Amino acid sequence: MGQTVTTPLSLTLEHWGDVQRIASNQSVEVKKRRRVTFCPAEWPTFDVGWPQDGTFNLDIILQVKSKVFSPGPHGHPDQVPYIVTWEAIAYEPPSWVKPFVSPKLSLSPTAPILPSGPSTQPPPRSALYPALTPSIKPRPSKPQVLSDNGGPLIDLLTEDPPPYGEQGPSSPDGDGDREEATYTSEIPAPSPMVSRLRGKRDPPAADSTTSRAFPLRLGGNGQLQYWPFSSSDLYNWKNNNPSFSEDPGKLTALIESVLTTHQPTWDDCQQLLGTLLTGEEKQRVLLEARKAVRGNDGRPTQLPNEVNSAFPLERPDWDYTTPEGRNHLVLYRQLLLAGLQNAGRSPTNLAKVKGITQGPNESPSAFLERLKEAYRRYTPYDPEDHGQETSVSMSFIWQSAPDIGRKLERLEDLKSKTLRDLVREAEKIFNKRETPEEREERFRRETEENEERRRAEDEQREKERDRRRQREMSKLLATVVTGQRQDRQGGERKRPQLDKDQCAYCKEKGHWAKDCPKKPRGPRGPRPQTSLLTLDDQGGQGQEPPPEPRITLKVGGQPVTFLVDTGAQHSVLTQNPGPLSDRSAWVQGATGGKRYRWTTDRKVHLATGKVTHSFLHVPDCPYPLLGRDLLTKLKAQIHFKGSGAQIVGPMGQPLQVLTLNIEDEYRLHEISTEPDVSPGSTWLSDFPQAWAETGGMGLAVRQAPLIIPLKATSTPVSIKQYPMSQEAKLGIKPHIQRLLDQGILVPCQSPWNTPLLPVKKPGTNDYRPVQGLREVNKRVEDIHPTVPNPYNLLSGLPTSHRWYTVLDLKDAFFCLRLHPTSQPLFASEWRDPGMGISGQLTWTRLPQGFKNSPTLFDEALHRGLADFRIQHPDLILLQYVDDLLLAATSELDCQQGTRALLKTLGNLGYRASAKKAQICQKQVKYLGYLLREGQRWLTEARKETVMGQPTPKTPRQLREFLGTAGFCRLWIPRFAEMAAPLYPLTKTGTLFNWGPDQQKAYHEIKQALLTAPALGLPDLTKPFELFVDEKQGYAKGVLTQKLGPWRRPVAYLSKKLDPVAAGWPPCLRMVAAIAVLTKDAGKLTMGQPLVILAPHAVEALVKQPPDRWLSNARMTHYQAMLLDTDRVQFGPVVALNPATLLPLPEEGAPHDCLEILAETHGTEPDLTDQPIPDADHTWYTDGSSFLQEGQRKAGAAVTTETEVIWARALPAGTSAQRAELIALTQALKMAEGKRLNVYTDSRYAFATAHIHGEIYKRRGLLTSEGREIKNKSEILALLKALFLPKRLSIIHCLGHQKGDSAEARGNRLADQAAREAAIKTPPDTSTLLIEDSTPYTPAYFHYTETDLKKLRELGATYNQSKGYWVFQGKPVMPDQFVFELLDSLHRLTHLGYQKMKALLDRGESPYYMLNRDKTLQYVADSCTVCAQVNASKAKIGAGVRVRGHRPGTHWEIDFTEVKPGLYGYKYLLVFVDTFSGWVEAFPTKHETAKIVTKKLLEEIFPRFGMPQVLGTDNGPAFVSQVSQSVAKLLGIDWKLHCAYRPQSSGQVERMNRTIKETLTKLTLATGTRDWVLLLPLALYRARNTPGPHGLTPYEILYGAPPPLVNFHDPEMSKFTNSPSLQAHLQALQAVQREVWKPLAAAYQDQLDQPVIPHPFRVGDTVWVRRHQTKNLEPRWKGPYTVLLTTPTALKVDGISAWIHAAHVKAATTPPIRPSWRVQRSQNPLKIRLTRGAP
């Protein structure tokens, strides 16, 4: 009784005073409350063996210390004082601790050495692998365990295990099992009390501390014995722990404990790894362990000998009986443990963490544990770390159950809530949840209330609507009837006027209506309803009206429901019917008259046919009215019966109009046929599993679930659900419910999410759900599409099979299952409280909208039907995704094949639609075609789809039209030629200009569709014939097959030729047309023989093509395609009918293609390649281009045999082909009007002049790809120069000849002259520029009066014969021409004044430019583009800053960023007194206005008084409303300096640099990285550094240097007495008189000194620098007008802030160069205008 247990924690708390004294000696401070928190709660979580009651074991204390001192976010700096104090107590225990401390030495962190026998001293032991060794001296026994006064039990404080009994001597040859059995049997199991007391009473045995469970054991004779692992231990470890890949941390902890407690050998470690790890995991662990091997320098090494020595992969020869062998083993275990830890680090996968959500019935605490475990497994973050508490808290809120998460998000002050608070709140919410019965009852009650309320609202709304309609209809019909009567009576009929004494009720005189005796008395009864059809002017009572007669008609393609009104003269539409006509009618109603407009003519579908009618558009009418005008056209008959009005047609049949969807509108134009599979049909009863109507939703049971692979770099995408209207949500709700009931949609939780898009079906109010899978499609791997091409799918259908069956599979994609791993990809959000759904839904089947769905389904169905095709080889089965066509030769075969196909589909799990089935018919519709008797037609539906499209207004609408019409192009001859005007408008960036040509082409295509012929199906057993024609670059043809004596068209083909082929002569264009159409026809012929018939004999052209027109590549392509005699043959030349492209009965005029092609000439008819006998000149031209010193140089020359006529260097980079063209062109220009023979060795120049130039010109100077050809300007110049000589012969000669002929000598001289010109003569850029452009002819020069005055001053002469002035031997160019030329040159180059001047000086201009330099400077300065980009060279002089007149009145403030220090300080707020230079700096964690005002009010104001002026930059903390409001309230003038001008805050900016430099030096000198600790020393230096006037800020402020003490001075007594207070005051007064006033005067003198102002004035135009420019963005913006100026800054129009003068530059406003001048005249009312220039 009364006994208590003494623990280390309780012991320290009882002696807390001594603990605080020890902590003070360690320079730390501890508190009892926090020590109680850390010891039992924090330190046990470090997993180092710390007990909750504490321990004095130094090994455990050191391990806890290492955890506390860990760098980075996992450290615990707040626990440092407590663990340091605890360590000091353990190292030097006070008297009250010594009795409870074990005398054993603390474990050393070095590698352990197992002793081979008893030793004199205990060896050092590792904290990780403790090896228990006997102590030299036994512990003294305690005489008393239980104290008489109820003292604590002391035995619990020891760290040693209970002592074992004495071990008997063991025989040397005895085995270990028998020894251990003997040992165990000799020692009975003691009770806890006995073992506790025995340790205090009996001394321990010599080897009592040696473990008996290790594989390496110390025997009784001091020898180590080996005990391997038992199979039961390995089995238990394997089965009771998770795998390494599943939970590496837990398995690593197990192996660590095994290595610590069992001391396994190398073989045991391999056995342990092989049992607990897989082969791949083991290899990864061994690899990481070898990476952790360290060399002699302590760093990881990669030397093989050192790695193999420390961590061998093969069995080492270690001797465990020696200390060296045991040290090797200990190191191996340590490396192995490091490898386990490194290999167990899994990469960060936050998606896995996000996937952890709270279960429906899971408690919040259990969910939190799962969430923390996910953080440990999938991230490197520790969820217990305080720094990660925010992330864990947010995950806990977001991933909780929806009801808990929503309420947690609404908590007040959520940021201050800890994780423990959130769990507590979540538990409250979880415990207050309603039971499923209560929730179901609440849902039922709410549903009933909602339905009841909705029903009442609907009834009330319906009553109000009927009442309003009756009232408005009464007014309208009364107005109509009144108008009709007035029309019949010839005018307006007014009510007769009453006399003064006449009754308005009975019309008798003598009384009024209120006193009329005939008027009924009593309460007024309910007013009877008025019949709409019996209204009259006065109104009257009628019988109960019959049901409203209504009828639905189709107006303009839209169904409209009308109210039949025989009294209405005209039919009325209420809604906007589209365009309205200009006609209008005046409608007089009961409430007044109003004018309404008529609609344009609308097509109305009546029972008697389609008519055109115009309606009266009355938006105020409550219902559309069917008046007598349409009833007459309808020939309707109205019969009134007791049951109501009945409307019938002219033949007595009821009038009914079908209302249907827009996409099914085309079915109205088709011949109606009865469905082949009716509800009572035998096809349904015989094959119930094959039809969707009887078999339900299909499921392909033989197809494995599909796995959708993602791209390697794909990450989950989550797109929130778009807002959805209530109408749309209710519209798709039934579809969602149906898919949920069928299991196609299931609830899920997925990181993927894509929105649901409700799409309204046209013409109805029904919606269908469509999922936007665009982002998912981007992240899924692409597969090659194998869906058949409908263009040639029917080519495999032989004409002999004329019995068809068409099946359309219902919900085909939903028949294929999705693998569970791929289902989360297609998740979408859906909320329906009525169904109890609030979350995500995903597809279990293949969804629609997925890009690979058609291909996957097509392949799956094709594989499933493979056996059917093998078993029925006589049948033809065509498949296009989910559309099947079965063809047979007879009706019986078709029926049998259809039965087999339906049975196969049912067995496979697919379902066909009975409504759309076409079984065993000779005419069916398939893929938009009508198939019958081996032919195919365009269905009327396809034609109506194209015909119903309106005229395109945008490129997108035009592309839609061409796409729809292009599907039918096989039926339209010359389709490419018709659509040629339309295709240019579809290009991006082209202006959509719809003109007459486009309208004509649009109507021609529609007209061609209406007359589309029937095309025969391709018969692959017969040869094909292709008739080809070409016209104006368009290839046209028809593919036919023989049917008896006739040719039946199979397809009409047309295509536009490429630009190269379009420029050829007609015969060659025919070759290109045949090649293009033969390639397209191959898609239908499937490689069958093809006979080509054309009006040209092109076979000879293909066999021997002219090399001057065709390139080798194109020639090879044509020959390989057209000379394949096994497949392509040429028929006789035929003349084709341009309408049908079929041969004419009469033969056309024959011609020889080769002969015509040979007669085709180039540009110049007289041009030849043979020398002219009587030529005036024979010249040789050559161009040269070569590399010299890394630069390509070029030149051109024209020579005779012996002399050089012309040679010129060309710009660098000029190609040899261009140089040849320039040389040849120059020769032709110099031979103008003469006979010339010119030789060139360039095949390119020769072919361009003779052949290719004309070809280029014909095809618009474009390549085959449609791009512009190279050397375009040179080719055009050459073609133009060909007409200059009188007679011309361009002759090709071989280059680099060595003979002595005239041709060889001339060619060598031309080549040599061109090379020398390229090397010696600099390129004449200006001359080339002028030659390439249109030259300025002196005959067009016009000189102004100013030009003439200048010319006379220069001494220029006037050339009378040529009409221009000459100066320095050159024609003088007038000033206006000079301006235009230089302005054009500058716009091309945008060079500056100096560069353009140098360029013009270097060139040899043929003209003298008047006022060139002045004009050049003007052009360069007035260029707006250069002004926005070029840098400014203007320099602004330094200004003078305003300073305070005394300390504390004027401060400059700034934030500067410093690298993060301790406790999160990363900013420094600096205050500088501008008068004295005194600096105050405060470390801060944030850069906010709150901190600025706080430091100003708490630090600056109490010490220095209230500032008068504050100067800062435009930072957010200074311009915020908080800072400015505080300054305004305190009367502080807050001056904001110019942006991006640090000189404006120069004093504080310079101080920022000084403080940072000082802190850098101090950190390097002291070795610490805590700059906050060193900040006072930096401020001390800044405050005691002399300023510009030789005084330090401290001296200016206090009048003397700071007191310094020399502690080595022998006379320290003189520092003990300080001056009196009066002396201090006198000194400060002297400072104020001798220092402050002169200093203030000096500052004032600086302000009074004149400062050179900037040159800008109010009204000037300036460019403003853009300080943050993006890529390819000009550096200047503007120009702006200057509004205000200061000596250093400006305010411009359009920018609110002041701008420093250094950030602007003057904008040169180009003055208008007038072409007219104004002069005064003698008459004051007249002025004189003269042409001129300034």
From Swiss-Prot:
One of its GO terms (cellular component) is viral nucleocapsid. Pfam families: Gag_MA, Gag_p12, Gag_p30, MLVIN_C, RNase_H, RT_RNaseH_2, rve, RVP. A lipid is attached at residue 2 (N-myristoyl glycine). The RT polymerase active site binds 2 magnesium ions. Mg(2+) 1 binds at residues 808, 882-883. Mg(2+) 3 binds at residues 1454, 1513. A motif (PPXY motif) lies at residues 161-164. Residues 112-217, 433-498, 512-551 are annotated as: Disordered. One of its GO terms (molecular function) is structural constituent of virion. Keywords: Aspartyl protease, Capsid protein, Coiled coil, DNA integration, DNA recombination, DNA-binding, DNA-directed DNA polymerase, Endonuclease, Eukaryotic host gene expression shutoff by virus, Eukaryotic host translation shutoff by virus, Host cell membrane, Host cytoplasm, Host endosome, Host gene expression shutoff by virus, Host membrane, Host-virus interaction, Hydrolase, Lipoprotein, Magnesium, Membrane, Metal-binding, Multifunctional enzyme, Myristate, Nuclease, Nucleotidyltransferase, Phosphoprotein, Protease, RNA suppression of termination, RNA-binding, RNA-directed DNA polymerase, Transferase, Ubl conjugation, Viral genome integration, Viral matrix protein, Viral nucleoprotein, Virion, Virus entry into host cell, Zinc, Zinc-finger. Its cofactor is Mg(2+). Residues 344-392 are annotated as: Interaction with host PIAS4. Residues 1443-1601 form the Integrase catalytic domain. The record marks 129-130, 214-215, 477-478, 533-534, 658-659, 1329-1330 as: Cleavage. A zinc finger (HHCC-type) spans 1386-1426. Residues 433-474, 485-498 have a biased composition (Basic and acidic residues). A motif (LYPX(n)L motif) lies at residues 128-132. PANTHER family: GAG_P30 DOMAIN-CONTAINING PROTEIN (PTHR33166). Belongs to the retroviral Pol polyprotein family. This is Gag-Pol polyprotein. It comes from Radiation murine leukemia virus.
